[in-house]
């Protein structure tokens, strides 16, 4: 479960950034997780709620935006959201597709005081 290690690092980054900015309490954290990132949102949420400690994260809420897989065909230039990555364009059947969304894993923002 690599989500535990990822979440521990995420909390460390948030703590360091909050300290630099003089923030004493983080209220809300928004993450973006892509469907192809190999990161399970439920495991990150569990890890966040398990690992957050101290006054900085006391009331912190985690919001996760899940990004679907989007591909672009390099032949017909179609852009499509797909349920699962399949290396063929759903419009023309070409195998020349690029993933343009779905690999993300980042902190979008956090709110604190």
From Swiss-Prot:
Gene Ontology molecular-function annotations: nickel cation binding; zinc ion binding
Binding site for Zn(2+): 73, 76, 89, 92
Claim: Translocase is one of the keywords in the record: no
InterPro entries: HypA/HybF
Assigned keywords, A-Z: Metal-binding, Nickel, Zinc
A Gene Ontology biological process term: protein maturation
UniProt-annotated binding residues for Ni(2+): 2
Name of one Pfam family that matches: HypA
Record function comment: Involved in the maturation of [NiFe] hydrogenases. Required for nickel insertion into the metal center of the hydrogenase.
NCBIfam families: hypA
Sequence similarity: Belongs to the HypA/HybF family.
Protein name: Hydrogenase maturation factor HypA
């Amino acid at each position: 479960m690599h989500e535990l290690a990822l979440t521990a690092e995420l909390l460390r980054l948030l703590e360091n950034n909050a300290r630099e900015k003089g923030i004493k309490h983080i209220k809300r954290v928004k993450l973006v997780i892509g469907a192809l990132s190999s990161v399970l949102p439920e495991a990150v949420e569990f890890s966040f709620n398990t690992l957050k400690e101290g006054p900085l994260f006391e009331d912190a809420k985690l919001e996760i935006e899940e990004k679907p897989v989007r591909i672009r065909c390099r032949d017909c230039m179609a852009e499509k959201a797909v349920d699962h990555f399949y290396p063929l364009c759903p419009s023309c059947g070409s195998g020349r597709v690029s993933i343009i969304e779905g690999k993300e894993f980042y902190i979008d923002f956090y709110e604190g005081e």
